[in-house]
C-alpha cells in the first residue's frame, strides 16, 4: 500500500513520500521469515511453558496464571475448518493437552485423503475444538528425526534449541480470506519454527536444511488443512493442490519467494527515499543505481513517475549539487534524464576543478558545521551576480538561496561564534603571484551557511545595491530601521533586522566604512560593488584585487567556484552583543500571525478545529506556535455571529448508531439544498452534497435545476471520480425521500451499478443528520463569507466550494485527522489560499490597446479544481476567470473595515503566506485609483452604503415660535474619518427595478422640530410644520457673511443668514473635514428648514392661501410661496372648487363597515383615500353606477362550446398558490412560421409577399456573409451542443410591409456556447420619455433611423453551426456561423458592443453613465433600441452629420428626418407620437390597438355602453378554490397571458392610469376564475373604449431656466392579500408625466405612515437616476421635488426625534429616507389627497374621482 501511494498521488511532497515508505519496517537480513511485528501478530515468543511441578488430569485442571497456558478438556464441537477459531486461535482454559500437539495425528492412524475432503478424525472430546487422540501417542516432533540425526546447521540447531522446551505451542490463526493468505503464511511458518520444524522450511535459495519425515509431513498436512480452509485459499495455492494435495512444501516455497520479492520492493523504495549524493562517487554509478531501482519498481507494478523520482533524487543532493534543489524545484515537467544531465555537468566541472587545483582540499569541518536552523519564512533566494567572466570559465549566477526555505536541519543560532581552522588557499589566477604572499583564511566568527560558500569571506556582488551580512559581530552603530525595503532578484522582500556601518581595515592601513544591512535570511554575506565604488574602491578582476582609483592595492580577491570573494579579516569587529543586535528589529518571519487573520483565512472555522489541524499537520506551511492564540478564547467574529446565527445546537448522535462498518468511500450520504431565489440564470440555484461515512470527505456540485437528468449526471460524475481516484466502489448511498432521489431513472441507475439506496423513513430527519449538518455548516460558512466579503449573492456557490476545500482539510477533534488525511491526500498548503473575497489585480493578457491598463480589479474566490490557478471574480467583465496572473491588492481587506476588528491589518501576514505566489506586479508598481465608480451592470444600480452610523447629537432642541429663550448649547458630532475602500459590487434586489447609481452624500445633522402632530395618510388634522421641507443642507461652499440678506438668488453655491455665530463641526461626506454650521437661534432654526434651497428663489411672504400651505409663523420668515409654487406649478393636478372652512366630522364615522373578505381584496377595499367622496354626498350618481356594467360571459361561451365528451379529470387551483406562482407575463407570439406563411397559406397575395420577403432576407444574409459558404459540414462531425436550430419567422408590420427574418433558436441554445455574463442592452423607456420631454421644451429636431440587419454587422466569437435554409435542400449538412444571427443569446450583446464602439470612436459620442444605450455629445443625443435610433438635436445639420457617418459603415434608413415645422407623426418603439416643435407632443397607440384588440377574440361592447373607468371600488376576488378541467384551465391561462400581456404593453408605454388594475390582474394569471376573466374583459373593454386617448404634453414655460423633476407618491395601506399595501409613484419632468409605477409592497406594513414611507423610499432611487440623466442631457440646473399626502411622513422626514421610530425596521427605513432626502437635495411638499394623481396607482376609484385625477394628462 505504501508503494502504491507514490504512483497514485504524484503530488505528495518529499516528506509525505518518505513517511509513506519508511513507515513500513523492512529488515535486510537473509532470513526471509524474520518479519516485522507490525505485520505479524505478537505470539508468545517463549511459547507456553508448562510447569514441570504441575500435574493435570482430563477431569480437572488448575487454571494457569498465564492465559497462554492450556489444559486438555473433552470437546464436542465440530472441527475448526467448519468455523472460525475464537480469540486469535488461543486455546481456552482447561483445553491444554499434556502430550503437546500429538492429536494432530500419526501416519498409522490418519490416512492421506484428498484435500477437498474432511479428514477422518477420532471422535472429538465434548468441549474440544480439535479431535482427541490417545495420550500415549507422542508428538512426532518430540524426538529428532532418524533421517536428520544431528546434521542440522547452526541456525536450525538454534531454532531447535530455542523450541526444544516448548511443550505447548500457540497455533496460527484461522485463514478467513484469500487476501490474508500472505500474512497467514508468515504466522504459519512461525508456528512451524516454534514446533521444531524450522529445518524443513525452504531457505533463501529455495532448499530446506534437511529432509522432511513422514510424521512431519503428516503433521504439516493436517495443520495446514485445519487452519487454512480450502474456500479461503488463493487460486495459485489451489492450482498446486489440484496436482498434489500433499505438496505443502511447494506452497511454502512459493510463499517465501513472494515474501522476498515484497522485501526487495520495500528495500528499493526505502533506498530511493533515502538517496544521498555529494559527488564522492562517479555520477555514472549514481545514475545506474537510481535507474535500476526505478526500473525494478516499474517492472513490479510500482510506477514511479518523473516528478516523484526527481523530488526524491533532489532531496538527497548535497554539496555543490544542492543548489539543483532550488533551481529545479519549480520545473513541473522535469524528467530524470534532464536532472542527471545537470548532475553530470556539475560532476565533470568538479573533476576539472580538482585537477586544476591539486593542492586545495576543502576543510571537512565546513560540512560538519553546515547544520543550521533558521526561522520559518517563505522568502526566496537572493541572486548575486559577478561583474566579469574569466577567460576559461563561465560566469554563473551565484547559487545563493534563502536558507530559511532550504535548510531545515537543526543548528546553532545565526550569530553564534565558532572557530574554524585556517587553511592555505591557492589562487586560481596567475596575477595573484604579484602580491608576493600566500593567502590564508583568517579565523572567522561565522558558521558556514551553504555548501558552496567560501567560509570567512564576503561574496562580491555587482548586481546588489546594498551590502547584506548575517553576522552581528561586524556591524557598528546598529539601529532599527524596519522601513527599509530590500528585495531579491525575483523582487521578493527580504526582512531586515537592523542597519549599521561595516568598517574595513585594509592591508595598507586604509580605513573606510560603508552601510550594511543585517538579516539572517540570506545564504551568503554579500558585499555590494556599488557601495564600494561610492567610497572610491573598485574590483579589478584581471589582477583579482580590490584597489583604489590611484592603483593602490587594498585586498586580494579569491575566486572560489564561479564566484569572487574577499576575506572578512579586513572587517573590524564591533563591541555590540549578539542579543542586542538581534533585538534591534524583530524579523517579520518571527512575528506571530494574529488569530483573527487565520480565522478569516480558514473560512471562519472555530479555534479548536484550527488548532487540531495545525497539530496534526493537515494545514501545512506553518505550525501552531506561529499563531497568536491569546485572543482566540474571547474573540467574537461579527461575521460569524451574523452568518452562523442559529436557534440551538443540533442533536448529537442522531445518525444510526448500529450501522455496519464500511471501507472508505463505500458508504455515502447525500442531500440537495435549494433553491436560492432571485439569482441570474447563469448562477446555480441548488447544490448537491456528498459525504463519505468513513473519512467524512465532502464533495459539492452545483445544480441549476432538480431534473432527473441533472441529478443523474452528478451521480455518474462522483462514482467515476471515486472509482478512478480512490480505487473504491460505492456500495450504499443514503438519501432522503425527495422525488429527485426516488425517481425511476435514478433507481435504475443505482441498481445497474450494484449500489444499494438507503432511504430515510417517513418523518425521521435524525436518520439523515450527516448530510443535513453538512449543508447547514456550508450554508453558515456561505452566509459568513458573503457577509464578510460583500460579494454579490450570485457567487454563493463559490463560497460553498471555498468552505468545502477548507473543511476537508480541517482535523476532526474525534479522529485527530482531517478528511484529506483519512483519504490519503496531502494536507492543504495555506500559502496557496487567499481569504474569500480578497481584492486582487488580475493581469489582462489581451488588452484593447497598448495603452490600455493591464490590470483588472477582481475578488479571489477559491482555488481552481482544474489547474494550479485561482478562481477570481471580475466585476467589470461580469465573469470569473481561472488564472495565476494576479497580485494581492495591498491595504484592502474587502469589508473588514465595517466592523471593529481592533484596527487589525493583515497585509503583512498575507504577504508572508503568499510571498511565493506574488506573480507579476511588484508592490511598488501598484497604483491605487481614487475613482471607484464602476459602470453599472443594470439600468439602475448603486452601491448603497450599509455602514452603521455613529450616534448623532442633536444640534439644538427647537422650541415653539413664541418662545424667547436663548439658544441652547450646541454639542459636537463625533468626527468621522473617511476611508476609501474598494467595495465589492452589491446585488440589486430583483424585486426593485430602480435603484440609485450615484454616490449619495451622508446626512448632516438637522435641527429638531417640536410640537408636531402626527396624522394618518390624507390627514384630517391641522399640522403646524413646514409643508415644504428641503433637507439639503449644503456641505460645501458654506460661509458666514456680515450682511443679513433675506433673498435667495439662484446659484450653484448659495449664501445664508450667518453672522456672529459659533461654528460647530458636523459630519461631512466624501472625506471633507472641518465643515461647520453656525449656531442659530430657535427662530432661525425654523426658518432654515424652509430656506435651505440651493436653486429656488424666495421672496417675502404676502399671503398663505396658495395651495392650502400652512407655513411656520416667524417674524422674519422668507416666503415659501414661490418655492412651493415652483414645485407644484404646471403639474397636471385637478382643479378643485374652493371650499369654505368647515369642521370635518370624525374620520372614522363615515367609513363603510369592515368586510371580512377585505384582506383578500385585489381590486378594491376600504381605505381613507375614498373618505372624501362620501362626506358631502351619500348617493352615488348614475355615472358612478356605470362601472357595474359587466361583460356577458354567455356571448363568449357560445363561441367556444365544445362537443359532449366523456368526463375529464379536473384540477383544483388555490388562489394564494396561483398568485404566488406568477413570475412574469409571457409575451404573445405575433409572428408566423414558414409553414403558416408560405406552405399552407391560402391567401395567394399574402403568400407571394411573404415569398418575396423570404428571398430578400436570404440575399441579405448572403450579402452580409452570415455563414461560411466555402464548406458544408456533416452533422456527425460536429459536437451536437454547438449546433443551433434555426427557422424563418414572418410578420406583417404596421405600415403594411411583409417581413421575413432568419433566426436561431436561442431558447434551446446550450449554455456552453455563449457567455451568460454578456447583456443585450436597449434604451430604457424612462430614458426615451425623458429625451422626448426635453426635446419638446428645447425645440429639438427629432430624427428616426433604422439600421437594416443590424445584428449581422457583429462578428461571432464562438464556434457555432446551423442548418442551411430550407431552399438549399441540405438537411443533413451544417454551415458555420460567422455573424451574430438574430435569436442567439450573444447576438444582442455583440451588436451592442459593435455599435457602441462605433458611436464612441467614429461619431464622437459618449454613453451616459448608468443609462445604457443613451449617447450624447455637445449637440446630439441618441437613444438606441437594437436597430432603431432616435436622434435629438437643436441643429438639424448635427443630426445629418451623424447620419452620414453611420452610412459609411451600416445600411442606414431615414424613417423620419423631422425637419418640418408642422405636426410630424412618428412611430417610435410602438408609440404613435404627434409632435409640433415648440408647441406640444401627443403620445398614443390608437392605430395599434385598433388592429390588435379585435384579434384577441374578446367580446367588445356587448350592451352597447361604454365603460368610464377600468374597475370599481369595493369589489373583491373570491378566494374559493377553482375547479377546472385540465385542458380548459390551460386554455384560460393562455388567454389571460395574451390579454394581460397586451394591457401591460400599453400601460407601461403611456397609460399609467391603468397600472394598478394591470398589476393586480397580472397576479391572478394562474387563477382564471370567471370573476377574474370578467375583470380582465372589463379592462380590455376600457382600453378599447379609450384607445383614442393620448398622453398630452405641452411645452413648459418656466419662470427660471431650470428643469423641475417631481415624483408624486401614494400608498394604500393593507388592501392586498396577506395585508400587503399597494404603492404607486408618478414621475413628472417640467410638468409632463414621463412614467409611473404601481406594485405591491414587498413587506407587510404596520401602519399607513409606514406604507407611505415605503412608497417614498421606493421612488427616491429612480428620481435620483432621472436627475442624473436630465443633467447629462441638459446642463440647466435641476430642482427635485417629492410630493405626498401624508403629513405624518413629512414630520418624520424633517424631524430628528428618533423616538418616533416604533421598531428597528421602521426606524431604519425612515432614517434611510431622511438621509436620501437630505443628501439628494429633495424638496418634500404636501399635496392634498384630492389632488394626488398618484391615487390612481394604488386603489380602484369611482368614475368621478378617476376622471378628476386623470383628465389633465390623459385625454
From Swiss-Prot:
- Gene3D superfamilies on file: Ribonuclease H-like superfamily/Ribonuclease H
Specify the Integrase catalytic domain's residue ranges.
660-835
- Pfam short name (any one): TYA
Which residues does the annotated region (Integrase-type zinc finger-like) include?
A: 583-640
Q: Mostly located where? A: cytoplasm
Q: Site annotated as Cleavage: where? A: 401-402, 582-583, 1217-1218
Catalytic residue positions: 461
What GO biological process terms does the UniProt entry carry, in alphabetical order? DNA integration; DNA recombination; proteolysis; transposition; viral translational frameshifting
Q: How is it modified after translation?
A: Initially, virus-like particles (VLPs) are composed of the structural unprocessed proteins Gag and Gag-Pol, and also contain the host initiator methionine tRNA (tRNA(i)-Met) which serves as a primer for minus-strand DNA synthesis, and a dimer of genomic Ty RNA. Processing of the polyproteins occurs within the particle and proceeds by an ordered pathway, called maturation. First, the protease (PR) is released by autocatalytic cleavage of the Gag-Pol polyprotein yielding capsid protein p45 and a Pol-p154 precursor protein.
Domain Reverse transcriptase Ty1/copia-type as annotated: residue spans: 1338-1476
Where along the chain is Mg(2+) 3 bound?
1610, 1652, 1685
**Modified residue annotations for Phosphoserine:** 416
Per its UniProt record, what InterPro entries does this chain match?
Aspartic_peptidase_AS, DNA/RNA_pol_sf, Integrase_cat-core, Retrotran_Ty1/copia-like, RNaseH-like_sf, RNaseH_sf, RVT_2, TYA
Protein localization: Cytoplasm; Nucleus
Q: Where is this motif: Bipartite nuclear localization signal?
A: 1178-1212
The region called Disordered is annotated at 1-93, 126-173, 352-421, 956-1087, 1092-1111, 1130-1186
Record's Gene Ontology CC terms?
cytoplasm; nucleus
Give the matching SUPFAM superfamilies. Answer: DNA/RNA polymerases, Ribonuclease H-like
Q: Name one GO molecular function term.
A: ATP binding
Task: Give the Low complexity compositional bias ranges.
Answer: 153-165, 402-418, 960-969
User: Any remaining note in the record?
Assistant: Retrotransposons are mobile genetic entities that are able to replicate via an RNA intermediate and a reverse transcription step. In contrast to retroviruses, retrotransposons are non-infectious, lack an envelope and remain intracellular. Ty1 retrotransposons belong to the copia elements (pseudoviridae).
Q: How does it assemble?
A: The capsid protein forms a homotrimer, from which the VLPs are assembled. The protease is a homodimer, whose active site consists of two apposed aspartic acid residues.
Supply the domain comment.
Answer: The C-terminal RNA-binding region of CA is sufficient for all its nucleocapsid-like chaperone activities.
Q: What's the name of the protein?
A: Transposon Ty1-MR2 Gag-Pol polyprotein
Q: Which organism is it from?
A: Saccharomyces cerevisiae (strain ATCC 204508 / S288c) (Baker's yeast)
